């Protein structure tokens, strides 16, 4: 997948709702809004209803890309990348936060690309206590290295702090 979203600027509604009825309403009411470029689904819907059912509900109303955010996918061993890529079948792209190191990051990116998934990589989160400078576990250099490795793997889409 070369470009996840077809436009240079877009809105990506985050479908963090608790059931398929609320998802249906959200998608129906936004899919024709100019500027909506994709939909982001997360683990609440995916684990409760399954990715195929969630994707099917969205596809009833739009063919816009569906981005799956597993709330920190790529934080496990490198070998699970291929299993993850198979498990998210139906999504067009995934968000990875590879905090477990370069081996995992590269393996998961390669597995997702092999499965024809778009890849978006995040390295920094903005909640209190995340970064070492805010008494968190993750140091600032590590987050920068995550982005550098992803760019080296030809990733062009990133989750970056907006504040």
Residue ranges and their predicted role:
Residues 7-8, 75-76, 80-163:
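Conserved anion-binding
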């Amino acid at each position: 997948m070369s470009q996840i979203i077809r436009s240079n600027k877009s809105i990506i509604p985050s479908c963090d709702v608790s059931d398929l009825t609320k998802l249906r309403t959200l998608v129906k009411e936004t899919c024709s809004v100019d500027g909506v470029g994709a939909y982001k689904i997360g683990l609440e819907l995916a684990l409760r209803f399954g990715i195929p059912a969630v994707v099917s509900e969205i596809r009833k109303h739009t063919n816009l890309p569906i981005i799956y955010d597993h709330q920190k996918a790529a934080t496990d061993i490198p070998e699970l990348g291929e299993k993850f890529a198979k498990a998210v079948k139906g999504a067009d792209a995934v968000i990875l936060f590879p905090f477990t190191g370069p081996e995992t990051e590269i393996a998961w990116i390669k597995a997702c690309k092999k499965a024809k998934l778009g890849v978006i990589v995040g390295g920094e989160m903005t909640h209190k206590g995340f970064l070492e400078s805010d008494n968190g576990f993750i140091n600032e250099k590590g987050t920068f290295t995550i982005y550098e490795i992803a760019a080296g793997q030809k990733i062009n889409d990133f989750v970056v702090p907006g504040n």
